[in-house]
């Protein structure tokens, strides 16, 4: 089957309403892009929990609607334009064909083995490991965050490789796919816990961990609180985002044993000062490494009696 895309360039004020109207008029899907992408006028829009973007579209937006090839695209545009109070003649559009493809093969071709650090490979299931003697994780792109391709995941993996947690306990908070927990287990940790607020992430992590023959226990936060497991760890890793990390500073710091280490990522280089300040009452953090504008922060508690929180 083939499809036809309707491409419309509009001002920000009409982008969201026109997108909804195109869906109502019969489009199969609609996306909004920056019409100036790749030019000097490109306008980045991004956010994170507690810091959402103030605008839902770009000043100069491109609305792309996917339709069946046999549909009347002009009628769809006219109906959508009328719904948002525009004359059909005021909404210029172009059409482009989308041919049928082998989407499985196309998707697989976009994911090659990833080499991380000195000796870690993340390998999709349809590839062979380039170096079977390396630390190899078989991991397919899926529903949970974490395949090693993002700089923050890479930074945490490189830290773990540089500081092998042999015989130590490790907490991966915000575990996503379980990739960091699995690396810790393969590097010698004998007690690895992964925690995530998303049940789907826990499901994905369990699947990945079984596939990779690792020993990791995964919990939702409330489940961990009642698990009876020790609540402090030799190493705590959290690859989330700056704002949640700041909010969780007392809790995450309290999970670190005296003499233990805390590693944070999901932090932009421009956010180092504010994140470090949030943790300053509990632990001193410094930049361990930076990659593509993202950093890993690391710190160590002084040795002493355990005082972690439950």
From Swiss-Prot:
Q: Which residues bind S-adenosyl-L-methionine?
A: 153, 174, 196, 239
Q: What is the protein name given in its UniProt record?
A: Ribosomal protein L11 methyltransferase
> What are its GO cellular component terms?
cytosol
- NCBIfam families referenced in this protein's UniProt entry, alphabetically: prmA (TIGR00406)
Instruction: State the PANTHER family in the record.
Output: ELECTRON TRANSFER FLAVOPROTEIN BETA SUBUNIT LYSINE METHYLTRANSFERASE
Q: What's one GO MF term for it? A: protein-lysine N-methyltransferase activity
Q: What does this protein do?
A: Methylates ribosomal protein L11.
Protein's cellular compartments: Cytoplasm
Alphabetically sorted, this entry's keywords are: Cytoplasm, Methyltransferase, S-adenosyl-L-methionine, Transferase
> Which lineage?
Bacteria, Pseudomonadati, Pseudomonadota, Betaproteobacteria, Burkholderiales
Gene encoding the protein: prmA
This entry's Enzyme Commission designation comes to 2.1.1.-
User: Pfam families, per this entry?
Assistant: PrmA
Q: Name one GO biological process term.
A: methylation
| Annotated organism of origin | Janthinobacterium sp. (strain Marseille) (Minibacterium massiliensis)
Record's signal peptide? none
